[in-house]
């Protein structure tokens, strides 16, 4: 796909070329979206709205590190919805990985998570964050064991992936109401890149076939159930709910 590729001063231009080849990215000088390699990380920018800043994946520091250390742990809604209990740590396929945040929370609690991401730019961002995380002394060991990335379309991969996971987790893109600065920033940049998941409804059926225990679907609190199929149960938070479909 076409995107503006930028190598900042101090970054490795050959690494950017290799990255573009790996993910099938073609430089387009006029593209609004830019993938920027800085000396620290790979990030996504919206060139016509520079004040939004860059979006990148960081499992080592910042928000995700704080959430790992001081978040709700097993009390987090996503952990409850997945079904983590005592010694039971389900295996998970996160079929709409995005920036990998929920997958990271679940991996930090001990679950093995295989992430699927079909968009090459998002997959590149996520892989960059994973590679830096793998090298970290504190989290690198378990991160390599518990979080892996597959660049593939969920619709086809859900029919082929082996072994079967206990849980399939879905968090498809949905048009967000503008409630917070974070949502405004990330959703404006992300939706400019990938748009809404127009085919999201088609994920539920193959997910239910694949999962051994349950499918969990994260939805905004105002959104209808995925594919119009009512869930058997749900875990709710202030802005979201996690719809649960037993298998």
From Swiss-Prot:
Entry keywords, A to Z: Cytoplasm, Methyltransferase, rRNA processing, S-adenosyl-L-methionine, Transferase
Location within or outside the cell: Cytoplasm
Domain of life: Bacteria
Keyword S-adenosyl-L-methionine appears in the UniProt entry: yes
Family annotation (Pfam families): SAM_MT (PF04445)
GO molecular function, one term: rRNA (guanine-N2-)-methyltransferase activity
Record CDD domains: AdoMet_MTases (cd02440)
Binding site residues for S-adenosyl-L-methionine: 101-102, 117-118, 153-154, 171
Reactions performed catalytically: guanosine(1516) in 16S rRNA + S-adenosyl-L-methionine = N(2)-methylguanosine(1516) in 16S rRNA + S-adenosyl-L-homocysteine + H(+)
Keyword Calcium included in the entry's annotation: no
Main localization category: cytoplasm
Catalytic activity, EC: 2.1.1.242
Coiled-coil regions, chain positions: none
GO cellular component, one term: cytoplasm
InterPro entries: 16SrRNA_methylTrfase_J, SAM-dependent_MTases_sf
HAMAP family reported in the protein's UniProt record: 16SrRNA_methyltr_J (MF_01523)
Family to which the UniProt record says this protein belongs: Belongs to the methyltransferase superfamily. RsmJ family.
General function of this protein: Specifically methylates the guanosine in position 1516 of 16S rRNA.
The name this protein goes by in its record: Ribosomal RNA small subunit methyltransferase J
Organism, scientific name: Photorhabdus laumondii subsp. laumondii (strain DSM 15139 / CIP 105565 / TT01)
Taxonomic lineage: Bacteria, Pseudomonadati, Pseudomonadota, Gammaproteobacteria, Enterobacterales
């Amino acid at each position: 796909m076409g995107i503006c590729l930028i190598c900042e001063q101090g970054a490795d231009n050959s690494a950017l070329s290799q990255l573009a080849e790996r993910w099938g990215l073609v430089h387009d000088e006029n593209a609004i979206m830019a993938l920027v390699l800085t000396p620290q990380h790979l990030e996504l920018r919206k060139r016509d709205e520079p004040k939004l800043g860059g979006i990148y994946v960081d499992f080592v520091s910042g928000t995700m590190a704080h959430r790992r250390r001081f978040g709700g742990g097993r009390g987090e809604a996503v952990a409850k919805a997945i079904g983590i209990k005592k010694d039971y740590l389900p295996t998970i396929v996160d079929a709409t990985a995005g920036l990998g945040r929920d997958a990271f929370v679940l991996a930090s609690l001990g679950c093995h998570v295989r992430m699927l991401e079909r968009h090459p730019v998002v997959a590149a961002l996520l892989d960059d964050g994973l590679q830096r995380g793998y090298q970290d002394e504190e989290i690198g060991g378990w991160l390599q064991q518990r979080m892996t990335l597959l660049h593939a379309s969920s619709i086809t991969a859900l029919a082929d992936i082996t072994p079967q996971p206990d849980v399939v987790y879905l968090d498809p893109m949905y048009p967000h109401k503008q409630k917070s600065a974070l949502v405004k920033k990330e959703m404006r940049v992300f939706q400019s890149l990938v748009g809404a998941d127009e085919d999201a409804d088609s994920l539920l059926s193959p997910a239910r076939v694949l999962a051994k225990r349950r499918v969990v679907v994260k939805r905004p609190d105002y959104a209808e159930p995925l594919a119009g199929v009512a869930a058997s149960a749900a875990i709710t938070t202030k802005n979201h709910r996690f719809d649960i479909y037993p298998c």
